[in-house]
A protein has these predicted regions:
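Short, structured beta-strand/loop micro-motifs enriched in basic residues and often containing a Trp
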Residues: 135-143
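Short, acidic/polar linear motifs in exposed loop/turn regions
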Residues: 7-10, 166
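Glycine-rich active-site loops that engage anionic ligands at enzyme catalytic sites
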Residues: 93-132
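Asparagine-centered strand-capping/turn motif at beta-strand->loop junctions
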Residues: 2-8, 114
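A residue-level signal for conserved active-site and pocket-lining positions in enzyme catalytic cores
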Residues: 19, 125, 153
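Short Pro-Gly-centered flexible turn/kink motifs
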Residues: 2, 148-165
Length: 166
């Protein structure tokens, strides 16, 4: 659960996000399950700058609401899902065992990643309110894509849930 309180007299600009990682036997073949979705718009990361390549989104096609992680899935580092597209995503081992579900009704963005070309034994499912800059952005924080704002004297509260199944 997160609570943001603005005790100042000016608007507060902020980003917050969770960074849960889940152990898997092997990244290869894991399933990402997006219930009720047939496809998603996905923004990759420009690795040299560490910024979002929002001008070149990819379409992530799903088969029966499922995307199977392959050898090159995380070549662009993080799959970023903007505009509140993802409110719930499940991660399942390739053999169908061990399923974990992230439920994040207020997340404006969700990042899914594993270290580039490492076949590391984990995948991160991250709910975000705000995210990294778009490639080439040089403006002020208040103008940053996805930045959250909170008026003086106000507070904001939200939470996400992780469900672990066998």
């Amino acid at each position: 659960e997160w609570t943001v309180k603005n005790t100042d007299t000016k608007t507060l600009y902020y980003s917050i996000g969770g960074h849960p990682a889940f152990n898997v036997d092997s990244v290869m073949g894991c399933r990402l399950i997006f219930e009720g979705m047939d496809k998603l718009s996905c923004t990759g990361i420009d690795l040299p700058t560490g910024t979002a390549d929002a001008e070149h989104p990819a379409t992530l096609a799903l088969t029966d609401h499922v995307y199977t992680v392959g050898e090159h899935t995380f070549d662009a580092d993080t799959m970023v899902f903007d505009e509140g597209q993802v409110k719930k995503v499940s991660l399942q081992e390739a053999d169908g065992t061990k399923r974990v579900t992230l439920i994040c009704p207020d997340a404006k963005h969700v990042g899914i990643w594993s270290p580039v070309q490492k076949n590391a034994p984990f995948i991160c499912l991250e709910p975000w309110l705000g995210r990294c800059d778009n490639k080439g952005f040089t403006g002020e924080l208040k103008d940053k894509y996805g930045e959250q704002s909170l008026e003086a004297g106000k507070s904001f509260r939200t939470a996400y849930e992780i469900v672990v199944e066998k």
